[in-house]
Amino acid sequence: AAVPEAAAEATAEAAPVSEF
């Protein structure tokens, strides 16, 4: 399921910095 950019940003803020 593709999540909108807004949700991705919110998830990035809440989740730890691991994607970078």
UniProtKB/Swiss-Prot annotation:
The keyword Metal-binding does not apply. Keywords: Secreted. It is found in: Secreted. Detected in the hemolymph. This is Haemoporin. Homopentamer. Forms a cylindrical structure with a central pore. It comes from the Eukaryota. GO terms for cellular component: extracellular region.
